[in-house]
């Protein structure tokens, strides 16, 4: 399963672990993704999204209908 937020588009970024001796080893910083079901009252159905916690805050602020319309406008199947 890909580590990409469906709402914000957040994806893993790469960086370094740093030891006390400042040795660098490559690592991935993963987004805080959650699988969450939202009830869409206008469609009378549940929609399951894989979104970051920032995406959940966006849905809380703008509403699920607005976010779904934006996703469908970008061609995301929901």
Swiss-Prot record:
One of its GO terms (cellular component) is cytosolic large ribosomal subunit. InterPro entries: Ribosomal_bL28 (IPR026569), Ribosomal_bL28/bL31-like_sf (IPR034704), Ribosomal_bL28_bact-type (IPR001383), Ribosomal_bL28_sf (IPR037147). It comes from Idiomarina loihiensis (strain ATCC BAA-735 / DSM 15497 / L2-TR). Pfam families: Ribosomal_L28 (PF00830). HAMAP family: Ribosomal_bL28. It comes from the Bacteria. One of its GO terms (biological process) is translation. The keyword Ribonucleoprotein applies. Residues 1-20 are annotated as: Disordered. This is Large ribosomal subunit protein bL28. Belongs to the bacterial ribosomal protein bL28 family. Keywords: Ribonucleoprotein, Ribosomal protein. GO terms for molecular function: structural constituent of ribosome.
